[in-house]
């Protein structure tokens, strides 16, 4: 009889170990199922965060486009004003400078002078003896 009790005790131990393995496996599976369910919820939250970020980026792009459009209009306005100023300055700065040339056996020589027309020539005593002609050989 003693042997049977020992065997029964051994079977109880075997049952206990299998029972404990089952319990451990059940808890593992439950934890795994809970962890799988949590990412689904977090995926939804990640998706909403991603949508929010996309909306913010889109708003930033639209704001930048509006700002660039305004800046382009300002740049065009400034450019047109600069162009008008440059045209006015060119009109004011256009000075006719006669170019004179002479062909010789040594080559063709070109020169300019800053002498005024004959009507506005001052008396000869006001002129200095420094030559102000510019010349170059072609």
From Swiss-Prot:
Disulfide bonds: none annotated. Keywords: Notch signaling pathway. Transmembrane segments: none annotated. GO terms for biological process: cell fate specification; negative regulation of Notch signaling pathway; Notch signaling pathway; sensory organ development. GO terms for molecular function: ubiquitin protein ligase binding. Belongs to the M4-like protein family. It comes from the Eukaryota. It comes from Drosophila melanogaster. Part of the Notch signaling pathway. This is Enhancer of split malpha protein.
